[in-house]
Amino acid sequence: MNKDYDVIVVGAGHAGVEAALASARLGNKTALITLYLDTISMMSCNPSIGGPGKSNLVTEIDVLGGEMGRHIDEFNLQLKDLNTSKGPAARITRGQADKYKYRRKMREKLEKTENISLIQDCVEEILVEDIKDTQNSNYIKKITGIKTRLGIIYNAKVIVLATGTFLKGKIVIGDVSYSAGRQGETSAEKLSDSLRELGIKIERYQTATPPRLDKKTIDFSQLEELKGEEHPRYFSLFTKKEKNNTVPTWLTYTSDKTIEVIKEMMKFSPIVSGMVNTHGPRHCPSIDRKVLNFPDKEKHQIFLEMESENSDEIYVNGLTTAMPAFVQEKILKTIKGLENAKIMRYGYAVEYDYAPASQLYPSLENKKISGLFFAGQINGTSGYEEAAAQGFIAGVNAAKKIKGEKPVIIDRSEAYIGVLIDDLIHKKTPEPYRVLPSRAEYRLTLRYDNAFMRLFDKIKEVGIVDKDKIEFLEKSINDVYMEINNLKNISVSMNEANKFLESLDIEERFVKGVKASEILKIKDVSYDNLKVFLNLNDYEDFVKNQIETMIKYEIFIERENKQIEKFKKLEHMYIPENINYDEIKGISNIARAGLDEVRPLSIGEATRISGVTSNDITLIIAYMNIKL
């Protein structure tokens, strides 16, 4: 058996799958090693994809050549368009996955992809050698391969670690704890020790998941039914479906009695007893944490979501907890519709090792070990979408590393992927990181619906998307700009414009003749309305949507573009790699420590390091002007 590979990906969750596919699609012989082949792309918690910021990540992965977007479009129970009454920066799609079909079909995709070998084993050791750095006479460590629990050595030029919650994973339910990376699945106990021995800093986080209920024991007559869209906005531009699934979800609420039971049983909560003493995701708190933090809140939303059309398991979104089994049962009896519900799987917390991402370059390669990339929860993130985005970038850059090409770096003005990676490297967070629109300074530019436009140059740089699709996207982009220019040059008389508005029951009126673009700026006027009125060209929906948005929000987009120009200037003020921050007088100790840890490549990057102030930046620039 040939055990030599270009790239080895460790872990086959959402990060590992995207990394392996990206590497293989770029022509590299790739091994994907996982503890369990049957749980590839497993949705360990909520069986859904998308949400604020997260949907943006998925569309970005998709246009660059990743898999998640088209996969959730195909294997979902429902898709829901959210925030449709809000501005374009807030509009998104959320998909409820058929988790078993999603998982099975992703494995099939991997098995049918050329250059990928699937291997079930546990990686226990990272193998390296010392080589002389070409830029100086120092020695650096370089990847040579991995060693598994079975004693097998696999050789590789590059390794991507995408280990999820399995590094020294420990499950907690009440006062019970045991080693596992996921309930019923063993943990990887030795790999993080190997990383420590290589000088990589390791810390601990935790996350948790709610109980799963037996659908047959739920009284749905007491619940509010919520259906998806028959014709949603899909995650992928290349998805063509006549009609989407509309399997419902259901809404209920906790009651006064629920809060009373939780307060009464709070002493059994692992976060109170000390059984869990690491940080969990702030934006997905357990129900006991919610009651602790918001003791006066009378009720909390609970969404009941099917996990698959071929399963009776119901995911209880909003009831995450690791309280003892008997307490979980007590809580259910206080919730409308769930009084007689039977638990199929109890909620639990899982603690695990991760490696703070300040140790990485923006390519996601480790700074100490050449050829070692990290992606997903091992970098301190939560969420399938965050994992997939990192996995894709790590897989692409692993391939670029082997070819001796420059890594693909996406900055925070170009994509939510850039925001995610930039924040991970520069901003310390006390809990697993989640992408949010509030973290993105340029939200209007980084819309869910325009990834194909803002990332077009990166699509070509990555090199996965085929020529026909690139030509299709290029034509679509040209159509957008051509039609915007056309609308700005079409003159419409005052009388004709006002008759048109009257026909749409719009009260607004013009006092003089206008350009067609001014008519489209009116809130309730769509491109389709204008198309009929002025006999305009017809385009695909995603093109028409861009024409509308770019005209209606033109002033705001221009303002944001000016801010991006200022950002880019700082990004191109490069800091020498060998700069000695100890020589710069006046910098705070906190800033000096952060700068030494991250070693920013530009002034722009330095501004985003935790603890670095504007005064510190001024001193660095002054030092560079004098000394360098």
UniProtKB/Swiss-Prot annotation:
GO molecular function: flavin adenine dinucleotide binding
Keywords: Cytoplasm, FAD, Flavoprotein, NAD, tRNA processing
Co-factor(s): FAD
GO cellular component: cytosol
One Pfam family in the UniProt entry: GIDA
Subcellular location(s) per record: Cytoplasm
Annotated residues for binding of NAD(+): 280-294
InterPro entries to which the protein is assigned, alphabetical: FAD/NAD-bd_sf, GIDA_C_N, MnmG, MnmG-rel, MnmG-rel_CS, MnmG_C, MnmG_C_subdom, MnmG_C_subdom_sf
Gene Ontology process terms (BP): tRNA methylation; tRNA wobble uridine modification
Domain of life, source organism: Bacteria
Binding residues annotated for FAD, in chain numbering: 11-16
PANTHER family: GLUCOSE INHIBITED DIVISION PROTEIN A, PROTEIN MTO1 HOMOLOG, MITOCHONDRIAL
Role according to the record: NAD-binding protein involved in the addition of a carboxymethylaminomethyl (cmnm) group at the wobble position (U34) of certain tRNAs, forming tRNA-cmnm(5)s(2)U34.
HAMAP family in the record: MnmG_GidA
Subunit structure comment from the entry: Homodimer. Heterotetramer of two MnmE and two MnmG subunits.
Family: Belongs to the MnmG family.
Protein name listed in UniProt: tRNA uridine 5-carboxymethylaminomethyl modification enzyme MnmG 1
Organism: Fusobacterium nucleatum subsp. nucleatum (strain ATCC 25586 / DSM 15643 / BCRC 10681 / CIP 101130 / JCM 8532 / KCTC 2640 / LMG 13131 / VPI 4355)
